[in-house]
Structures are given as C-alpha cells and as structure tokens.
Amino acid sequence: MGFYHVGQAAFELLTSSFILVGFSDRPHLELIVFVVVLIFYLLTLLGNMTIVLLSALDSRLHTPMYFFLANLSFLDMCFTTGSIPQMLYNLWGPDKTISYVGCAIQLYFVLALGGVECVLLAVMAYDRYAAVCKPLHYTIIMHPRLCGQLASVAWLSGFGNSLIMAPQTLMLPRCGHRRVDHFLCEMPALIGMACVDTMMLEALAFALAIFIILAPLILILISYGYVGGTVLRIKSAAGRKKAFNTCSSHLIVVSLFYGTIIYMYLQPANTYSQDQGKFLTLFYTIVTPSVNPLIYTLRNKDVKEAMKKVLGKGSAEI
C-alpha cells in the first residue's frame, strides 16, 4: 500500500503543471516583449551559428581562441533554445502553463548551461593570458589536448552543478502553489514559492555559486591582472593596441554576463525582486547571447576575413 501511495504521488507530481505568470499582469507589454524576444532569438541563432560554421570551415580559425569561441557560440544557442520557445509560446496566447517535466528540464538546462558559461569564460581568459603573456610558448601551452580537456571541464562542471541544485529546488514543498512569478522556471522564483524554510537550500546554492560563479571570476581577474601588467610593459603603441584588442571583446562579454548572474544568484531569496529578476533574466537570456557574436566580430579581423571568404565562395558558386 505504501508503494502504491508513493507511486500515485509521483504520478500526480509528474502530471502536474506550473503557471508561468510572466508579464500576464501587464498584458499591454506581452506583444511588445514577444516581438523583441523573437527578434533577439533569431539574431542569436544567426550570429552564433555563423561563428560555429566559420570556425569549422576556415582553417585560419582552427586555433584555441576560436575553438573556445565556437564552444561559447554553441552554448549560447543551446541556452536560448532551452528557454525562449516556451517563453514565446506563453507570451503569444492565453495558455501560461508548463508541465512539471517541462519545468524540470528547463530548470536543469538553464542552471547547467549558465554554469558552463561561467567556467568557459574563465578558460577563455586563461587562453588570452597565454597568448599575451607567453606568446613564444603559446602553441605549446594551449595544445589541442589541453583545449579539449579545459572545454570538457567547463561542460562537466556546469552540468554537475545543475545535477545537484535542480532536483533540490524541484523537491521543495509548495503546499499546492502552482503560480511561478516569472516567464521561465528559474531557481530564485521556484525557491520563492516554497512553503518551508529554505535557508539550507540557499546556503547550498551559495556554496555552489562560489565554486561555479565566483571562482571562475577570480581566475578571470587574475588572468587579466597579468595581461594588464604585460600590456603596460609593451613599448610600442601598436603592440599595446593589438594586445588590448585581443582581450577587449572577451572583457565586454564577461562584464555583461557576470554583472547579471551575480545579482541574480548571489543575493538572499528574501531580497529578490521579481520585477527586477524578470528584466535581468531577459537581459542574460536574449540580449547577451545575441550581442556576443557582434562583440567578437566587430573587433576581430580574422572573423571578418573568414566571413568574406565563405560568402565570396558562396556567391561564386551561384
């Protein structure tokens, strides 16, 4: 009988659903947000797919820097595709529901891919450190095997972190509450629905955030501390400019991503503002992934030349 009740409870849980409130309390905003999100989503897919294809097709881009950049672009496509289609569906029509399983999958991938990006940005900072501070030994330091290992560490760290946090968040008692005051299943919003004390879970989340968010950020700051010292010792203005251009794109991306992530995940749940959270989530789920390709290509001569080469071949074949 006990097993029957457990099985019945599990079945009811898995077949239940959540209501994603999103912007339904501001219906005049829903159509505007739908159009904006759709445009940014298409730009994200186009821009990041372009970088992935260029990195694969142009032999000049078969370097550690572009290997990691292709990983970041693929990651951004996965990150947005894991959340944006459901968001567009809920914004477009009256149905604001998401199944429990759908919510679990969305939460898992949002946490996992966000964690991957934190670690991957640190790996890219180390690559820039090796390129600027150890130029004569760069190809020895950043050999293909190490690049593959560093990328694997980034992906495994993010998915491992989510494997701990996602189930813990989903298993919180909610006393029948189904309304998620957000437009996606995000950890702070789901923790805020709990009808029990969440201090232990918040402590666990904070500890993991130190590992997955703050530790990579510290590595980034250390790497760029060394890079800055090396750049200041370069005597020629042209050399300093080249070294700065090598790193500036990555620094802009780090600032955009980490600025929102730290605010979202390193503050106590009782100080979390849902309205601020919604707009910050919009920023790092649609704006940052869409501008990443633009930031890298505008300052990168190699990517521009590769694009011209590929487009030139395409037009010649036509």
Swiss-Prot record:
Protein's membrane topology: Multi-pass membrane protein
Localization: Cell membrane
Keyword Transmembrane helix in record: yes
Keyword vocabulary terms for this entry: Cell membrane, Disulfide bond, G-protein coupled receptor, Membrane, Olfaction, Receptor, Sensory transduction, Transducer, Transmembrane, Transmembrane helix
One GO BP annotation of this record: detection of chemical stimulus involved in sensory perception of smell
Parts of the chain that traverse the membrane: 32-52, 64-84, 104-124, 146-166, 203-223, 246-266, 278-298
Stretches of the chain found on the membrane's Cytoplasmic side: 53-63, 125-145, 224-245, 299-318
InterPro entries: GPCR_Rhodpsn, GPCR_Rhodpsn_7TM, Olfact_rcpt
Xref: Pfam families: 7tm_4
Xref: PROSITE patterns: G_PROTEIN_RECEP_F1_1, G_PROTEIN_RECEP_F1_2
Keyword Transmembrane: yes
Any one Gene Ontology molecular-function term assigned to this protein's record: olfactory receptor activity
Domain of life per record: Eukaryota
Cystine crosslinks: C103-C185
Extracellular side: 1-31, 85-103, 167-202, 267-277
GO cellular component: plasma membrane
Role description: Odorant receptor.
Similarity annotation: Belongs to the G-protein coupled receptor 1 family.
Name this polypeptide is given: Putative olfactory receptor 2W6
